């Protein structure tokens, strides 16, 4: 079993805004800021290795989702001249079960579906959907309202953004505290700004 004191030291810089629901069973490491009305399920992992992670308001991070700000494959973490790059996540995004997200910039109203994998060099704008099991590791900016789908990661543009998961967030904020212990909110000087 892991050393409990090691887990506490890794979570010193975790800031959770009032109104966020973050389950104790989630794994949050490094300098992470979580905005109000964001729900983090048990077994979700948010790991800030190469720089801070700032998560905006109203995001839904489901079980076994991995949001990680890691070093690029060609850099070692002990290199002194590496500047930490923040990962900024906007508002009303959904990270579904088992997805992996390394993108340093994510706009608003995006959905990363189950088992999808978004690489570090990708920049998601707003209103995008990355379909189940789709992998994007190209160095590009995904245009607004793009849907990536299918085994060949085909693309199309939808006319409207995905609807925010307001009702689901309200339901989870009411139900999760009944069945899971929550991490304490930390009052900070300010909540994450809208991007």
Swiss-Prot record:
GO molecular-function term, one example from the UniProt record: dynein complex binding
Lineage: Eukaryota, Metazoa, Chordata, Craniata, Vertebrata
GO biological process, one term: mitotic spindle organization
Organism: Danio rerio (Zebrafish)
Keyword annotations: Centromere, Chromosome, Cytoplasm, Cytoskeleton, Kinetochore
InterPro entries attached to this UniProt entry: DCTN6, Trimer_LpxA-like_sf
Stated name of the protein: Dynactin subunit 6
Quaternary structure, from the entry: Member of the pointed-end complex of the dynactin shoulder complex which contains dctn4, dctn5 and dctn6 subunits and Actr10. Within the complex dctn6 forms a heterodimer with dctn5. Interacts with plk1.
Family: Belongs to the dynactin subunits 5/6 family. Dynactin subunit 6 subfamily.
Function: Part of the dynactin complex that activates the molecular motor dynein for ultra-processive transport along microtubules.
GO cellular component, one term: kinetochore
Chief location: cytoplasm
Compartments where found: Cytoplasm, Cytoskeleton; Chromosome, Centromere, Kinetochore
């Amino acid at each position: 079993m892991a050393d409990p004191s090691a887990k506490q030291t890794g979570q010193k810089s975790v800031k959770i805004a009032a109104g966020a629901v973050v389950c104790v069973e989630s794994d949050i490491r490094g300098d992470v800021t979580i905005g109000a009305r964001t729900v983090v399920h048990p077994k979700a992992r948010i790991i800030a290795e190469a720089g801070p992670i700032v998560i905006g308001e109203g995001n839904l991070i489901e079980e076994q989702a991995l949001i990680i700000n890691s070093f690029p494959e060609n850099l070692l973490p002990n290199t002194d001249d590496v500047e930490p790059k923040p990962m900024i996540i906007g508002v009303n995004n959904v990270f579904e079960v088992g997805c992996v997200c390394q993108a340093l910039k994510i706009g608003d109203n995006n959905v990363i579906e189950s088992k999808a994998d978004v690489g570090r060099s990708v920049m998601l704008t707003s209103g995008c959907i990355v379909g189940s099991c789709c992998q994007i590791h190209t160095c590009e900016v995904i245009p607004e309202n793009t849907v990536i789908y299918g085994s060949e990661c085909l693309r199309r543009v939808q006319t409207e953004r995905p609807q925010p998961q307001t009702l689901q967030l309200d339901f989870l904020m009411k139900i999760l505290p009944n069945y899971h212990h929550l991490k304490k909110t930390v009052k900070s000087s300010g909540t994450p700004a809208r991007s």
